[in-house]
């Protein structure tokens, strides 16, 4: 089925805008492909170093250059619950490779930080830039020229975008992404949020809060709310970089093991040594990008991807803009309600029909490009399935459920939860910003109130504890952009502002920083660009200025005349403390080079 005319028009616009960069990118990919399997250009000394530690049979196969070699790029560490399962994946992948007549080696490891651990801490100021570090670290591993394809083991917030940037940089190689899956359900997410608010109000102590948090985050796998990590998995599947049905199967299950081994075998099957050569640089095009944005809107996904998708697309020579994202939001309906956009978690979403149901609905309604190439082959329709374990231990894929298993969690395109997507671009005299509307009640989407200005989230939290915020206001938290301090997430403010909203106050947030993908019920204009340190109007706001945030109309304005604003000096706080501690001193160059949020906030030229 062909995509709707409006979807086709936006895709064509992206393709036309991207022509020079995309052509240059594809020329580089084709030049690398024409060189053939890269082990053939290695000297005997190079090659001997490359397989010195391999098993004798693998060494013999690689020496003869007769089998494909699969590079494993892993983001394993055992502090991240989502990445702990990856400890055993290389052994599974090696076993699968041998069964398929190939070899697999760990090409390299990349860092993986947990935003849940660093939230509200100095380390959070490294979070966004870790994406580009991950891309560079993966590139180092793949630069040995030993591999015919690569698999990428990653799940969480910056890890998957960084890995995809690296994969596209090595676009002459096939690339398959392998997830670990979500942890089993624990304390319901709405109950966790309620307990956090009680703690913020001083009604319970740290012991009670820690007990609740530990019941929420209790085992291996991805956090179960629909934040950036699970948005990543949705994107990889809907853009055809996972094998069908791989995203949301729990870790340490026979089905997850079968999916992992199958992904390794599939990566080997699509190398230049076989008959289905699928280099990721050819495969991933503007249709793939649009499918990703459509999936993001249809599920109410993470605001972080209004930054990451732009950076990922750019790695393939594709120019995606906030306007494209906004225009698609006006077209694509919301089909999923997963916390913070609802009460269910991703396990409930998967049980209700999951990615297969969602993809089928979006294809049949004309919102997705079906005519794409994926790691599985031609077309996206094979992803409209439900993964199951077959009696022989392999993966079976019957068609997706005809009806949603729970229409409060997952619905049809004919009966959407709302007619438009979950993300919107705001414009006005404060610049441009992003707001996530899918978790905000319609009556809370317009706020007009005096500004209270803060230069850190700690300042706002201190004002709350001092009892100074029990009123209507718009919190302006500035100097949180990429150039100022690395654009940290300000997710801790959600609890404080949520308490005030529950007391009946009209509250909103305006910031040049980010919010977590889990951010919810309080309207928040985030990623304000230009940022305060880059000459943005947000640097000229003063306490008492009336700000109007209208998430319905898509506007963000300070109600002060232009002449008055222009005459004001920009605030210039001392930001020297941002440059030291927890490794921040090593990232001064990143802060200096970072692009604007609406350009992907990348440090690469």
Language model features by range: what are they?
Residues 1-68, 74-78, 82, 91-108, ...:
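Catalytic or ion-coupling anion/metal-binding cores of large enzyme and transporter domains
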Residues 88:
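Acidic/charged coordination and interface sites in well-structured regions
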Residues 107-145:
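N-terminal small/polar loop signature for handling phosphorylated ligands or for N-terminal nucleophile
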Residues 131, 153-156, 353:
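N-terminal glycine-rich "phosphate-gripper" loop used for MgATP/nucleotide binding
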Residues 131-138, 143-150, 461-472, 476:
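Contiguous domain-boundary segments centered on the initiation and propagation of an alpha-helix
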Residues 137-145, 153, 166, 219, ...:
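Mid-sequence acidic-hydrophobic segments that form the walls
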Residues 141-163, 176-178:
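A short, small-residue-rich loop immediately preceding and capping a beta-strand
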């Amino acid at each position: 089925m062909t995509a709707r005319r409006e979807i086709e028009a936006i895709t064509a616009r992206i393709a036309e805008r991207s022509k020079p960069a995309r052509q240059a990118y594809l020329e580089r990919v084709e030049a690398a492909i024409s060189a053939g399997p890269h082990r053939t250009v290695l000297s005997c000394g190079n090659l001997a170093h490359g397989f010195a530690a391999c098993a004798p049979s693998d060494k013999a196969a690689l020496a003869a250059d007769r089998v494909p070699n699969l590079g494993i790029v892993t983001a394993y560490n055992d502090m991240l619950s989502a990445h702990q399962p990856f400890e055993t994946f290389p052994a599974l992948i090696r076993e699968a490779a041998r069964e398929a007549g190939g070899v697999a080696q760990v090409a390299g490891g990349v860092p993986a930080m947990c935003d849940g651990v660093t939230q509200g801490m100095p380390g959070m100021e490294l979070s966004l830039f870790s994406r580009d570090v991950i891309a560079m670290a993966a590139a180092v591993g793949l630069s040995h020229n030993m591999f015919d394809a690569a698999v990428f083991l990653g799940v969480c917030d910056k890890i998957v975008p960084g890995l995809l940037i690296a994969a596209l940089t090595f676009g002459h190689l096939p690339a398959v992404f392998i997830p670990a899956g979500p942890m089993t359900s624990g304390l319901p997410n709405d109950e966790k949020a309620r307990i956090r608010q009680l703690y913020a109000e001083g009604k319970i102590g740290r012991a009670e809060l820690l007990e609740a948090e530990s019941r929420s985050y209790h085992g291996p796998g991805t956090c179960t709310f629909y934040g950036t990590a699970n948005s990543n998995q949705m994107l990889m599947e809907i853009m055809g970089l996972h094998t069908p049905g791989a995203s949301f199967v729990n870790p340490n299950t026979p089905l997850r093991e079968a999916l992992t081994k199958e992904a390794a075998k599939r990566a080997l099957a699509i190398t230049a040594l076989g008959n289905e050569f699928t280099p990721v640089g050819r495969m991933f095009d503007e249709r793939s990008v649009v499918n990703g944005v459509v999936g993001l809107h249809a599920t109410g996904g993470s605001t972080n991807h209004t930054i990451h998708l732009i950076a990922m697309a750019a790695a393939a020579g594709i120019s995606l803009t906030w306007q494209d994202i906004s225009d698609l939001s006006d077209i694509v309906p919301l089909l999923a309600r997963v916390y913070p956009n609802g009460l269910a978690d991703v396990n409930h979403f998967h049980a209700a029909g999951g990615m297969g149901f969602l993809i089928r609905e979006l294809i049949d309604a004309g919102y997705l490009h079906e005519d794409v190439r994926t790691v599985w082959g031609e077309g996206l329709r094979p992803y409209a399935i439900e993964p199951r374990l077959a009696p022989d231990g392999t993966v079976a894929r019957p068609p997706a459920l005809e009806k949603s298993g729970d229409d409060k969690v997952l619905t049809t395109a004919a009966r959407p939860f709302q007619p438009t997507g979950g993300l919107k671009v705001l414009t006005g005299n404060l610049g441009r910003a992003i707001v996530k509307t899918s978790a905000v009640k319609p009556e809370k989407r317009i706020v007009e109130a005096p500004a209270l200005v803060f230069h850190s989230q700690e300042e706002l939290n201190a004002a709350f504890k001092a009892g100074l915020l029990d009123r209507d206001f718009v919190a302006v938290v500035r100097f949180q952009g990429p150039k100022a301090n690395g654009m940290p997430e300000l997710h801790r403010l959600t609890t404080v502002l949520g308490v005030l909203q529950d007391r009946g106050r009209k509250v909103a947030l305006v910031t040049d920083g980010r919010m977590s993908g889990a951010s919810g019920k309080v309207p928040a204009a985030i990623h304000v660009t230009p940022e305060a340190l880059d000459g943005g109007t947000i640097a000229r706001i003063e306490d008492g200025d009336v700000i109007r945030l209208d998430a319905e109309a898509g506007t963000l304005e300070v109600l002060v005349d232009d002449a008055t604003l222009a005459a004001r000096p920009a605030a210039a706080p001392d930001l020297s403390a941002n440059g030291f501690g927890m490794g921040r001193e090593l990232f001064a160059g990143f802060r200096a080079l970072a692009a604007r949020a609406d350009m992907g906030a990348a440090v690469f030229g």
